[in-house]
Amino acid sequence: MRKKEGRTMIEIKDLWYTYPGRTEPTLKGVNLKIEEGEFVLLTGPTGCGKSTLLKTLNGIIPHESGGVFSGSIRVNGIETRNSNQMELSSAVGLVFQNPDDQIFSTSVEDEVAFGPENLCLDREEIDKKVEEALRMVGMAEHRLDSTNALSGGQKQRICIASMLAMMPEILAMDEPVSQMDPLGTREILNTVRELNRELKITILLVEHRLHELMSFADRVVIMDGGKIVLDQPTSKAFDYIEVFHRLGLRVPEPVELCHTLGIKASPLSAEEALAVLGAGNCKEKVKTPRNFSNPEEETGRRTDPAERNEFVNTGSGNIKYGDNRSENKGSENRDSIISIRDLWSGYEKNRMVLKGINLEIRKGERVAIMGTNGSGKSTLLLNLAAMLKPYKGSVKVFGGDIQPRNSYSFAGRVGFVFQNPDLMLFCDSVDEEARFGPFQLKYKDIEERTKTSLEAMSILDLRQDLPQSLSRGQRLRTAVASVLSIDPEIILLDEPTTGQDRVNIEHMMNYFKDNCSTLVFCTHDIEIAMLYATRLLVMDDGRIIADGKGREVIKNIEILKQASLTQPPVVEIANYLGVDAISITELVEVLTRRSSEVKKDDGENYERMSSELTNSELADSGVVNSELADSGVVNSEGIKC
């Protein structure tokens, strides 16, 4: 599509859309204009219509979806309803929310080459575009890999590379970094921002993780109930913080901290927050972690790579560092509900993903697993769920070996939710999905479990809906509900907060905290891990490199760096201020207490100094008593009024 003169790239007027089989419109009178070169962040509660809006830009809606469509959408001056998808697709690159919906080639190279091949380019130019696109997303070394062997985050990178190889005028991305580690997220967003600035590619990006996106976007658009309810420049968006709170959106920690303290400012980083709080320019100092329980043995002072089997005392507990391949070879702990010994596992015999894992998990623990994309987190969960056969070593659950051949005996006791919920949904309604697990129970018990699980995931009002018609976040909660209904003793979750807004994340994780016996979950969201896990495992290259309490592991910068993780902003701020806090609530409580203590000490010191100050001393100082009395500071006796 040849670029038209003028700067309006997307113009939407009074857009209404209703999916086939539904009576309630998903989009309700949307009006939106985006100019050439803008970077627009589109956010809103789960199920508000964000993904649907993106699909209208390249003609998937209404050309492929059907349904009832009205209104006008112009892309670079071209009316989408009157254009064919081939023409639209050359102008609009769409990255889907679920990478598995987009990837169809068996190799990374073929997937990225598909677009340029359809433009009938010569082989040399295609190779050049593939190489450059993979380099931009950090996947050049995976060019010949099978797409089936990639992690979720790596698949997202490949989908982005496929679009970059086409160099569209508009790049529309639906939660493109939701499965990436923090470092990978920044790398991809920096690449996208560079293309946006240098080539004036227009960006429309849907995301819930505002703390990672706000600093890249020029403009923030919020949807709710199929309508746009806020459209502001990034610099002014949090002037309307009540809208974010009302809709259950996650506000970046520095912004939330300032507003909680009554400071009208919207810093997007720890450094900016400290400047607002009067701590000056702290770009370097804020990165220095401190251990306030035992300063002599701070984990943050470690500069050497973690050695195998090394224990570091952190004052309030022990954290183990290293790959732990050779320890704990004896009998498993009697309290362990899960016991792993020297586990080697992978998808190809000559390419192991897990490399000598040893792990004990006790009943009642909530264990978060973090690490870089491809580090083995999902593979570890698949072994715990008996969906992968170990190449070497053993996995024991409830004291018995768990392997694919006898996994049926654990089916009702271990519940597993895939990273991609669509792999689990096959019924005609949400209600049927929740009923499927306990279908052999008595009718009354089935009813009770179904209702309880749907309520726990806040989808009771969607019970008659077709799962495939829901948003990704709603589909994920449906998959979780289908597992909760069998009432398992162990729940395994792979990225359970993907596609969820703040309210649904808190509701889900609080339910697990209060009702689940044992929980093991993978996540890239370090804030969630810190708040809801009793124990944090960090993985890198198929090995566990740290294992301990989250508030202790988080202080080790070297470990975090090795696993492509970063400290949450509130922890960075607390470190600089000399406060041991991992949440806004903790930090505010400490700062408030310190402020009160300072005021009390100042008052007591002033009282003492005033009472000790005699009239003669006042006279000697050249200050007249009557003048002090007139000032209201002290009375004629030299005592503070």
Swiss-Prot record:
One GO cellular-component annotation of the UniProt record comes to: plasma membrane
Q: What membrane topology term does the record carry?
A: Peripheral membrane protein
Q: Where does ATP 1 bind?
A: G44, P45, T46, G47, C48, G49, K50, S51
Domain named ABC transporter is located at 10-250, 338-566
Organism the protein comes from = Methanosarcina acetivorans (strain ATCC 35395 / DSM 2834 / JCM 12185 / C2A)
Record NCBIfam families: PRK13648.1
State the protein's name. Answer: Putative ABC transporter ATP-binding protein MA_0870
In alphabetical order, the GO MF annotations are: ATP binding; ATP hydrolysis activity; transmembrane transporter activity
- Outline what the protein does: Probably part of an ABC transporter complex. Responsible for energy coupling to the transport system.
Keyword line:
ATP-binding, Cell membrane, Membrane, Nucleotide-binding, Repeat, Translocase, Transport
